[in-house]
Amino acid sequence: MVEVRVPATSANIGPGFDCLGVAVNIYNKFFVEEIEDGLIFEGCADKFKNENNLIYVAMKKCFDKIGYKPTGLRIKIESDIPVSRGLGSSAACVVGGIVSANELAGGALNKKELLDLAVEVEGHPDNVNPAFCGGMTASISDNREVIYSKVKVSEGIKFCALIPDFTLSTEKARAVLPKSIDYKDGIFNVGRTALMISALNNGDFHLIKYACKDKLHQDYRAKLIENFYSIKKQCEKLNSLGVFLSGAGPTIMVMLREEDKDFSKNIKSFLETLKNKWEVRELKIDKLGTVVNNRKL
């Protein structure tokens, strides 16, 4: 049996649209074994127990590339990453599927080949890359090849995810984005993405509040998330370092100083006054990324 653990991820990190992402310590686990015949799923809803399951789709993509044909598969899923909340649940399934398939097939593909294949299936590297590598990454796709660099994050920072009880599909969140942008808005984001990376590198955490600003996606998507701006404003009142939409949303991610002990309690009290229910989860950066049979990929 192959056991694969994949972390949740938070993409964009404010201005780094489709290129910045960070792995955090929420996990999905996948237990996969080859059986004599059939396709058996455990740990997911009945509607996902078929060949359209994203984990199986990713596995088949890997098997086809390698030229391996399993006799049958049993796939058990232990999922802690909330679905359609902007925390990389689909990326985790894709990565988990591809990595487990590669292990079953004898490890024919190297890490670079696995990463490129996962991005081909998922479509964007911003979640897939940190899910593979752990930590924070800056990544691009160039002629179907994934190019990335790890972003050093200085000690002394943590994250807090505000996770609502409603979902938001990536398709719907992308549909509200404009077909084109103003040149000045592109410059706005380029500068703040550079500032974000530099501030995290150097521990200049007081600059994050400026670096979190964005003109490419957050304001368009905010209208799909009830009370986004009031929550953001309250987070800022509670001395957060920065607030941004996690991936396509609807989860709101907050950056905090490590020593901040009061934020979670205080923001939870505020969120309880709102219509929807919100879960508050303090998180750390996951530095390992994908783990296969208790070893780092």
UniProtKB/Swiss-Prot annotation:
InterPro entries registered for this protein in UniProt: GHMP_kinase_C_dom, GHMP_kinase_C_sf, GHMP_kinase_N_dom, GHMP_knse_ATP-bd_CS, Homoserine_kinase, Ribosomal_Su5_D2-typ_SF, Ribsml_uS5_D2-typ_fold_subgr
Binding site for ATP: P82, V83, S84, R85, G86, L87, G88, S89, S90, A91, A92
GO cellular component, one term: cytoplasm
Coiled coil spans: none
PROSITE patterns xref list: GHMP_KINASES_ATP
SUPFAM superfamilies: GHMP Kinase, C-terminal domain (SSF55060), Ribosomal protein S5 domain 2-like (SSF54211)
Leading EC class: transferase
Swiss-Prot/TrEMBL keywords: Amino-acid biosynthesis, ATP-binding, Cytoplasm, Kinase, Nucleotide-binding, Threonine biosynthesis, Transferase
UniProt-listed GO biological process terms: threonine biosynthetic process
The keyword Phosphoprotein appears for this protein: no
EC number, as in UniProt: 2.7.1.39
Compartments, record wording: Cytoplasm
GO molecular function, one term: ATP binding
Main location: cytoplasm
Catalytic activity of the protein: L-homoserine + ATP = O-phospho-L-homoserine + ADP + H(+)
Family, per entry: Belongs to the GHMP kinase family. Homoserine kinase subfamily.
UniProt function note: Catalyzes the ATP-dependent phosphorylation of L-homoserine to L-homoserine phosphate.
Protein name (Swiss-Prot/TrEMBL): Homoserine kinase
Organism: Clostridium botulinum (strain Okra / Type B1)
